[in-house]
Amino acid sequence: MAKNKVLGRGLADIFPEINEVYEQGLYERANRVVELGIDEVMPNPYQPRKVFSEDSLEELAQSIKEHGLLQPVLVVSENGRYHLIAGERRLRASKLAKMPTIKAIVVDIEQEKMREVALIENIQREDLNPLELARSYKELLESYQMTQEELSKIVKKSRAHVANIMRLLTLSSKVQNALLEEKITSGHAKVLVGLDGEKQELILNSIIGQKLSVRQTEDLARDFKINANFDNKKHGFKQTQTLIAGDELERLNQSLWDHYKLKAALKGNKIVLRCYENSLLEAFMKKMMS
């Protein structure tokens, strides 16, 4: 299959108009900016962004009420209807503010270009969820059959950045959902890459339930990896069964953390405790000797 033309070139015909409007301050020209009924604008079906912060939308809605919409949305006209290309957050906030109309720039663009613009607009947003960014990268790579190197040049990011973001897609669905719902950060998620699904979800439960920092998560993941790589032969014994099941270790960890800020990890046939708060260690020792 022949490779589609590079995405940057495919957008070249419409970017000059957008730049003219946004960068040169000409958006007040009557033939560019129109006032549309808020219900006339249909969401972009190719919008890769699925989750929007409610607090952020509320803040923007309040700003729109007080100052109006400062940056018009981009739309394309088709069969008497307007489809959103860029500005989903502004559209949602305007609806939240119960605005009857919205400022829009009508762009002359082919239907098949809508996905391209929506993806680029979202990729360039700083507040895009890392998982949504990874999915957008994946869609660009697959739709245009480009390499990560080519994509990195288009989005003006390093190839390492693109590769690291894409690795988030290897996480279990449960971890991906937690990242999408902002129950964990991208820092937490990156620590879990490379672990099997069961270990990912065990650590995920600890992150959420015990509010672990990224550093604490790294320590916990390191302990899991040490357990997996532990060579029993070096210690002169053959272990025929797991010393403690994963769910039992999780319950033990939960109890130790709640009472003594301790973490337990398996190392061969041993349970090793890591202390995170020295002041509670003495209480733990007294409990063990009582």
From Swiss-Prot:
Gene3D superfamilies found in the cross-reference section: 1.10.10.2830, 3.90.1530.30
Q: Which SMART domains match?
A: ParB
Disulfide bond among keywords? no
The record, for CDD domains, names: SPO0J_N
What terms describe the molecular function in GO for this protein?
A: DNA binding
Q: Which keywords belong to this entry?
A: Chromosome partition, DNA-binding
Pfam families to which the protein is assigned, alphabetical: HTH_ParB, ParBc
Q: What GO cellular component entries does it have?
A: chromosome
InterPro entries, per database record: Chromosome_partition/occlusion (IPR050336), HTH_ParB/Spo0J (IPR041468), ParB/RepB/Spo0J (IPR004437), ParB/Sulfiredoxin_dom (IPR003115), ParB/Sulfiredoxin_sf (IPR036086)
Biological process (GO) annotations?
A: chromosome segregation; positive regulation of sporulation resulting in formation of a cellular spore
The protein's role, per its UniProt record: Involved in chromosome partition. Localize to both poles of the predivisional cell following completion of DNA replication. Binds to the DNA origin of replication.
Q: State the family it belongs to.
A: Belongs to the ParB family.
- PANTHER family (alphabetical): CHROMOSOME-PARTITIONING PROTEIN PARB-RELATED
Q: What is this protein called?
A: Probable chromosome-partitioning protein ParB
Q: In the UniProt record, what gene is named as encoding this protein? A: parB
